[in-house]
Amino acid sequence: MNKKKLGIRLLSLLALGGFVLANPVFADQNFARNEKEAKDSAITFIQKSAAIKAGARSAEDIKLDKVNLGGELSGSNMYVYNISTGGFVIVSGDKRSPEILGYSTSGSFDANGKENIASFMESYVEQIKENKKLDTTYAGTAEIKQPVVKSLLDSKGIHYNQGNPYNLLTPVIEKVKPGEQSFVGQHAATGCVATATAQIMKYHNYPNKGLKDYTYTLSSNNPYFNHPKNLFAAISTRQYNWNNILPTYSGRESNVQKMAISELMADVGISVDMDYGPSSGSAGSSRVQRALKENFGYNQSVHQINRSDFSKQDWEAQIDKELSQNQPVYYQGVGKVGGHAFVIDGADGRNFYHVNWGWGGVSDGFFRLDALNPSALGTGGGAGGFNGYQSAVVGIKP
């Protein structure tokens, strides 16, 4: 074969190889998990779960109801099934990602109007997309001994929300965007940051007395208030009566009990510079660790750690250490949908962590901290931007 023909053949092979590697549709044909396969995966998982089966009289009692996620959360990325007898299963839509992403043995899954849940799920979507660049199925990771820790907040019945009565002392919405007129005159949501932090404080029933006042000015970019808007919390004067700050609220509590939780929520929100809104609020985890120590007198062991500084194994070891010491973890990330903050308060021993989302128990369950294929992480590195700039506040104790 002469050099000219050999060169043409080599170029043809390289072009063909480039086409295969650069064409995600071709790759998806090999690795996509269709709806039937996803449902079968959910059924197989349920059959292996004694806790889920315990809620049914027989296997025939268990029915699956597909949750319509919509947008980027739908279709080829993941499937969510609510279980008729209680609980849910989240299945990846691609075989290059972990088959099961999350589950619960009770309740149901609902991300509608819950920005922190939608944002966390969106991080799964981005990670699954990253995995689609690979040409190998998910093989799992080396078995790492993980503690089994039952939900710490559940053990005390702690399930807070962002509306009434938790938000009775948050700022009142003064103006709105088009289509949001019903929010005018209503109290702002507590925000997932304040809700997560307050739940951890209730777990510890600490402090009995506030330490330091705090004031700040709302960002002039906030569209819901007239500016300047200054907020102040007289935290140093507070006596937090944890007998009146209940683990959860149904609306039938006394006014004293309602005001006790709303005061705590407002103090926490202000102490972290909450950017209040009618249905959500945002703040950074660096402010959480500062507020817990400086304003509420928590131990100086409280500090923030960032996912990007750790390998997957070392990051999960940090979380495991906290849970083994009966210390719930404040967890936060940022994605396209927005920020998300929640509490990690348990582990099942199989790399799933129990999440309390702060929506009164809705969608609480066990979730993977990421959906990345180990091959996408490289050697020894963190997860780059594919873990939604995750951070955690650890060492939270009186």
Swiss-Prot record:
<feature type="binding site" description="covalent">
    <location>
        <position position="192"/>
    </location>
    <ligand>
        <name>E64</name>
    </ligand>
</feature>
<feature type="site" description="Cleavage; by autolysis">
    <location>
        <begin position="145"/>
        <end position="146"/>
    </location>
</feature>
<dbReference type="GO" id="GO:0044164">
    <property type="term" value="C:host cell cytosol"/>
</dbReference>
<feature type="binding site">
    <location>
        <position position="282"/>
    </location>
    <ligand>
        <name>a protein</name>
    </ligand>
</feature>
<keyword id="KW-0645">Protease</keyword>
<dbReference type="GO" id="GO:0140321">
    <property type="term" value="P:symbiont-mediated suppression of host autophagy"/>
</dbReference>
<feature type="binding site">
    <location>
        <position position="339"/>
    </location>
    <ligand>
        <name>a protein</name>
    </ligand>
</feature>
<feature type="active site" description="Proton acceptor">
    <location>
        <position position="340"/>
    </location>
</feature>
<dbReference type="GO" id="GO:0008234">
    <property type="term" value="F:cysteine-type peptidase activity"/>
</dbReference>
<dbReference type="GO" id="GO:0004197">
    <property type="term" value="F:cysteine-type endopeptidase activity"/>
</dbReference>
<feature type="site" description="Cleavage; by autolysis">
    <location>
        <begin position="139"/>
        <end position="140"/>
    </location>
</feature>
<dbReference type="InterPro" id="IPR044934">
    <property type="entry name" value="Streptopain_sf"/>
</dbReference>
<dbReference type="Pfam" id="PF01640">
    <property type="entry name" value="Peptidase_C10"/>
</dbReference>
<dbReference type="GO" id="GO:0034050">
    <property type="term" value="P:symbiont-induced defense-related programmed cell death"/>
</dbReference>
<keyword id="KW-0865">Zymogen</keyword>
<keyword id="KW-0800">Toxin</keyword>
<feature type="binding site">
    <location>
        <position position="162"/>
    </location>
    <ligand>
        <name>E64</name>
    </ligand>
</feature>
<feature type="binding site">
    <location>
        <position position="340"/>
    </location>
    <ligand>
        <name>E64</name>
    </ligand>
</feature>
<comment type="similarity">
    <text>Belongs to the peptidase C10 family.</text>
</comment>
<feature type="binding site">
    <location>
        <position position="282"/>
    </location>
    <ligand>
        <name>E64</name>
    </ligand>
</feature>
<dbReference type="GO" id="GO:0043655">
    <property type="term" value="C:host extracellular space"/>
</dbReference>
<dbReference type="InterPro" id="IPR000200">
    <property type="entry name" value="Peptidase_C10"/>
</dbReference>
<keyword id="KW-0378">Hydrolase</keyword>
<dbReference type="GO" id="GO:0090729">
    <property type="term" value="F:toxin activity"/>
</dbReference>
<feature type="propeptide">
    <location>
        <begin position="28"/>
        <end position="145"/>
    </location>
</feature>
<keyword id="KW-0788">Thiol protease</keyword>
<comment type="subunit">
    <text>Monomer.</text>
</comment>
<dbReference type="Pfam" id="PF13734">
    <property type="entry name" value="Inhibitor_I69"/>
</dbReference>
<feature type="site" description="Cleavage; by autolysis">
    <location>
        <begin position="68"/>
        <end position="69"/>
    </location>
</feature>
<feature type="signal peptide">
    <location>
        <begin position="1"/>
        <end position="27"/>
    </location>
</feature>
<dbReference type="GO" id="GO:0006508">
    <property type="term" value="P:proteolysis"/>
</dbReference>
<comment type="function">
    <text>Cysteine protease that acts as a key streptococcal virulence factor by cleaving host proteins involved in immune response. Triggers inflammation by mediating cleavage of host proteins, which can both promote host pathogenesis by triggering sterile inflammation and/or restrict streptococcal infection, depending on host immune statue and infection site. Cleaves host gasdermin-A (GSDMA) in epithelial cells, promoting GSDMA activation and formation of gasdermin pores, triggering pyroptosis.</text>
</comment>
<dbReference type="InterPro" id="IPR025896">
    <property type="entry name" value="Spi_Prtas-inh"/>
</dbReference>
<dbReference type="GO" id="GO:0035893">
    <property type="term" value="P:suppression of platelet aggregation in another organism"/>
</dbReference>
<keyword id="KW-1035">Host cytoplasm</keyword>
<keyword id="KW-0068">Autocatalytic cleavage</keyword>
<keyword id="KW-0843">Virulence</keyword>
<keyword id="KW-0732">Signal</keyword>
<dbReference type="InterPro" id="IPR038765">
    <property type="entry name" value="Papain-like_cys_pep_sf"/>
</dbReference>
<keyword id="KW-0488">Methylation</keyword>
<dbReference type="GO" id="GO:0005576">
    <property type="term" value="C:extracellular region"/>
</dbReference>
<protein>
    <recommendedName>
        <fullName>Streptopain</fullName>
        <ecNumber>3.4.22.10</ecNumber>
    </recommendedName>
</protein>
